[in-house]
């Protein structure tokens, strides 16, 4: 009996040790996954039945609305499970992110690696903030209104930050800067693309924008940044 109780206690401890911690500001929801591994999952979104997944959401842009998955339909070269995959060239991307063995880098696209070189995940996107400095915002984009999401570093921790409501891109960037993130990289959004989910302490799954599963574009999603416990 003592052995059974010990096993149950250990399982409960393991569950409680990993969860997504949420902070909020007046305009932002901030998700801090407690993780041991990050990967770019391609082709099919991780399922809630995968108990080791803590958080997953869309990452890189998808090119065309195809009925079959192709790595070449993901914007720019990307690293999945330690392997570099060839994507299509995307001029809109200005930065990138890589992670491996507990270390990560946000970078300009010009510095994005040509080979995996030990990185477990990598993808390119629009670089919003680098080393605490806001990057130039294009005049065509600054007044675009949407709910936005970004992969960020804040006080030495990785987090996913999302606007609480529809706002201009320029204001979203201002909110990130006010929150004092060190780095920020855009994540793909829009109806269908914005669906995400995370795991609360205790293992319960919480969906973000579950209504997007009904959007026509939902089935065309291609890649997800995924945090594992």
Where do the model's predicted regions map?
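Gly/Ser/Thr/Pro-rich low-complexity, intrinsically disordered segments
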Residues: 17-229
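Sec-dependent N-terminal signal peptides
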Residues: 4-13
